Amino acid sequence: MICTGKFCLEDNASGGIGFGILIGSPVRGAFFSRFVFYKEVITSMDIDFVVTWVDMNDPQWQVDFAKYSGKKGNEKNGVSEARFRDYGFLRYWFRGVEKFAPWVRKIHFVTSGQKPEWLDAHHPKIHLVNHRDYIPEEFLPTYNSVVIERYLHRIPGLADHFVYFNDDFYIINRISPERFFRNGLPCDIAAFHYNPSWSQWYKRIKNNMKIINRHFDKKEVMARFHDKWFDESYGSKARWNYLLKGYGKFITMRTPHNAQPFLKSTFEEVWEVAGKELTQTSGNKFRAVSDYTPELFRAWQICRGNFEPYNTYQDTKMFPLMIRPKKAAKAVYSQSYSLVCLNDNVHIRNYAKVMGNIRESFEHILPEKSSFELS
């Protein structure tokens, strides 16, 4: 970046030019040396966003859900309501995109055929995607997020570079295309994380690693892409990389639970080598220990060296609302990060109050309707 006075000209890695105004050089810990307000970003790289959403208040969805889950009304079973309930913040997701990431080419809004009444389906940047548009018919309906996610590369018109969002991932501060892609590659952190847990989530991650270890030699990968595995920006997040450098197998990787950049070609390649396993488990209508998660595609990307090293923890944060509701509301209000995950849980106490506080924080930073909302 070349700066003269308060104006900056940046030669973007994607091949475009970004023009901005340098508005300050505040430091937050060791993470940020400056903030740049981008007035305009011109890039030759098309980047799409994909966001998945479900409206559990839809009567037809409730009927179908009860049919396949065996859960009626408020009955309890192994299927958590928190995985599906919508707490009314989706409009802030769209407002955040328009205000803080206006450079996005297209938003692929993925549902089982639902649409919020307020959403402008005819907006030129919105592509409404029904599960039936890209998931094989024999696996529908599905209530398993990992099945919905593993077929994303089949979405019609999806750009080769895309960022995947759950509907609880929010952009709350200005963010540039280079935060997600540099030199045509996803920005990510390659770091191990030892997790001795035997939870269902961990078992699914182990399923991923079986495929990774079958196709990659860990020592060879870490030697070939040494600088990417030991990038100085990782700091203490890379400590297990040093401890496990001589270990022969890949183990659990650190997973920043937030917006994830992908190459569409990564999905296509994984399907070529692991299509049998992915197809066999696509019939799981709800989460199961036999599943493979989207972390498989991310890990494959990393092992291929198809990423640019970036400590994603420096500007993202996941807030479990069951234990950190006040910190979550404060982070949104003060825009402490670029990206946040507001992780719901069926056991949240004072649910209405917690969500009310977060809504107030969103209204503070995103009070105006976006062009995605009907007037």
Report the location of each language-model feature.
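Generic short N-terminal amphipathic or hydrophobic helices
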Residues: 1, 16, 20-22, 41
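Short linear motifs centered on Gly/Pro in flexible linkers and helix caps
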Residues: 2, 7-8, 44
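Aromatic (phenylalanine/tyrosine) cluster motif
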Residues: 7, 19, 31-38
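Short, low-complexity intrinsically disordered segments enriched in A/P/G/S/L with frequent Arg
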Residues: 8, 12, 25-28
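ER/Golgi luminal nucleotide-sugar-dependent glycosyltransferases, focusing on the catalytic module
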Residues: 41-163, 170-375
